[in-house]
Amino acid sequence: MSDTPQHIIIKTGTDPRNRPEFNAIREEINKINHPARPEVNWGLIESLALTLFRTHGVDLQTAVYYTLARTQKNGLAGFTEGCELLAGMVVGQWDHLWPEQPQARSEILEWFNTRVSNQLRQHDFTRDDLRLVYRAERALQLLYDKLQQVELKRVPRIENLLYLMQNTAKKLESASDAAKAQQTAAPLKMPPMVYLSVPEAEPVRTAAAAPEPAANIE
């Protein structure tokens, strides 16, 4: 499976539980809590989810599994792509999403919040991640705002992920500013002076003055 970001056209799907791709995804996801700790095939989950998106449409449960797989395989970049997909679905397609029950949607997003938070806390953020952090923060803000507007008995704690991205952005901004300040304040390094070793000058030898001829006195 290529790690190149996939362009997904959001077309909402119906109940995917009768689809073999969805059942295969669930089998892999169930390995997470298996006592034997078998290896989860995240690449397979990603591939099967994309197949479902193309042939059956996008549902909330599969989109969450897809985002988790992308995060596992591609770190912050995968997480950001998944958050943008989820934000687009929840904000633009809330009335048409599967599952239809608001409580089921809350449970799915709460499960996602817990699982992906554990993955992100293992990520070593650097200043190069700042652009992706901004994108993820924006998507999570849209997602959070929408969840505050709809009627839910229990609102999933997406703000935990939002705060994580906001705090990470502040830390990376501070590190970037400090690095720039240090670079600006660094003293100008001059190349070392070059000293030429010149042999001591020999004493100037002058010709002995010839005796002046004696004056002839007559």
Spans of model-derived segments:
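Polyanionic, low-complexity intrinsically disordered segments
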Residues: M1-R26, I32, A36-R37, V58, ...
